[in-house]
Amino acid sequence: MRWILHISLAAGAFAQTPDFQRDIRPLLAKKCVACHGPDEQARQAGLRLDTFDGATKARAIVPGDSENSRLLARVTHATRPMPPTGPRLTDTEVSLLRKWIDGGAVYTNHWAYEKPKRPAGNSIDYFIQAKLAEHRLTPSKEADRATLARRAALDLTGVPPEASGLAAYLKDGNFEKYVDSLFANPQYGERWAKIWLDLARYADTQGYEKDNKRSIWPYRDWVIRAFNDNLPFDKFTILQLAADLTPDSSIDDLIATGFHRNTMTNTEGGTDDEEYRDIAIRDRIATTGQVWMGQTWGCAQCHTHRYDPLTHKEFYQIYAFFNQTADDDHPSDRPVLKLTSSASTLVMKELAEDKQRKTRIYDRGNYLTPGDEVKAGVPAAFHPLPAKAPKNRLGFAQWLVSPENPLTARVTVNRFWSRLFGTGLVESEEDFGTQGIGPTHAELLDLLALDFQKDWDVKKLLKRIVMSATYKQSSDVTPELLRLDPANKLYARGARFRLDAEVVRDQALAAAGLLSGKQFGPPVMPWQPDGVWLVVYNGDNWATSKGEDRYRRALYTFMRRTSAYPSMMNFDAPNGETCTIRRIRTNTPLQALTSLNDPAFMEAAQRLAGKAVKESPQDPAKRLFELVLLRPPTKAEAARLSLLQRQTEAELRTQPENVSKLLRYSEVLYTEDRVATLIPDARTGAREWR
């Protein structure tokens, strides 16, 4: 019976005319386009197969007539089949090509390059449930209130919920009111600023070998305020790319241009400043393309993009937008905006009109071999610059957020979705091009993009997602559902994924009551192992912060590019050298060792122990669980906790010297004469908790 079903399904699939985007484009990209695509330097025999005109002009493809299409003859040749290297096309792939050609060889544009179309449905749950129905699946039940409260707080603010807000929600069940309180919390801006700073390749040092300190933290603070103030995303974009060119821009607006001053500066003696200025411009182009357009523009700096619509010439037309800034690869990192007597920050500044540089195409990307001069412009495959837009960075920024742009809203909506569900509707967040992964729910993506584009309201978008039944689902999974949808791409259950590095640390400190609420200002230096900065030869030292600064959010921790903060690095945080569109997620022994040995976690554990003993002396382990996860343990969890408690007590009674080791990094919490209030008496073996 199973084989009959498989055969019938396969027959049904073959009966349909192949779809160009789903079936043919990936096949051509994999087997043909490297030699017969848009890159004129790599093109063989003058043949293009990525466009209808290119493929039909040479009769490689004769629409409706596969027998006379040379492409079929070449890929099926008995002794010299194409492609000349690698595996030849399978019988199934040949059959797909044949059916597609006989069906008219219809080429369609890549989905991401077409403007979003408004679908019939108008809600997130409509599209999710429709897809589930196609696969004969049903949504999971709604998670309990405590779980939802913790999920939303960690997603929106990066820390567990505050006691008052949690208690109110658990009592009245008004989730919308609770979510609004999270948006009003200043910690919301800190959470989403950190996500944006990954894209901005933010760090507190210049990078490269010397990696000297630089002052750019006011840009970090600007991003926090922008999210808390719900600055419309189009203005958020324009200020970061071109506030210095925007009429009537304020000092705060100018700080926003730090986005592209986060590029690295090489101050080592003997380096060519122009070489590294050129590298910085390329970085700005690649970063802009990925952050706003989901495009790998950096691939076109040496040759025309092999797969996506950006020629070698067009790369340098974009280069011209960024080639007119006053910054260069200089130790002073000028231009610098003086804010106060003790604070300054790096900003962008356009060159005067009579100082403007000429931009030339660099042969094979080598700045030492300049070719033809080009003027600033945008890729021809996309919409032109807005009619009244200037041909500078300001006009380019306006082009990015134009209603005609098919990508910016989609890419941005997808990024926000990804941070709430662990994966985007388009999994390849960094690549919406032809080599990327297509959307799991294309109509839903278009709906969210079109609605977001109306007013570019980030909080409204996030609220819409977290208020959906899809977001509220329980993350419990049955073996059958895990088998049918292991990656949860159909969203039949709530998301379950590891917290970001900063949230892992911050939620531990918050649960223990240690996390400082202090915002803004210069970076701080919580404890890190001695000697970590010895890899940097510039003589800088890590001066461990004292008091409240020791317990500030990880967002404020000093970031050195060549020597990342160890506990953040172990949980996959980037070092700021390049734009990080999405972090990898690993599970390694180093993470367990970090949570067991890093003083931040040890001090959090000590404070939590004290709270648990004080509030529930008869069952402190259960109270610990409730303080961290905001719910009582299940029977199975309680049994495991009880076993762990007994094992720990036995170990401490037999090895009292471990007490001193556990407390050695504590700065202000506990001293050895107070240990008896936290653990069973190691000398008498008493089991009761004091």
Model-predicted regions and their roles:
Residues 1-3:
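Positively charged n-region of N-terminal signal peptides that target proteins for export
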Residues 6-16:
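Hydrophobic h-region of N-terminal signal peptides that target proteins for export
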Residues 15-98, 102-134, 146-151, 157-169, ...:
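Solvent-exposed helix-loop boundary motif
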Residues 28, 288, 292-298:
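Short metal-coordination and nucleic-acid-contact micro-motifs, chiefly zinc-binding Cys/His arrays
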Residues 32-35, 299-303:
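Short cysteine clusters
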Residues 122-187, 201-248, 278, 308-311, ...:
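Primarily short, surface-exposed interaction patches in extracytoplasmic proteins
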Residues 192, 197-199, 203-215, 245-284:
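Beta-propeller blade termini and top-face loops
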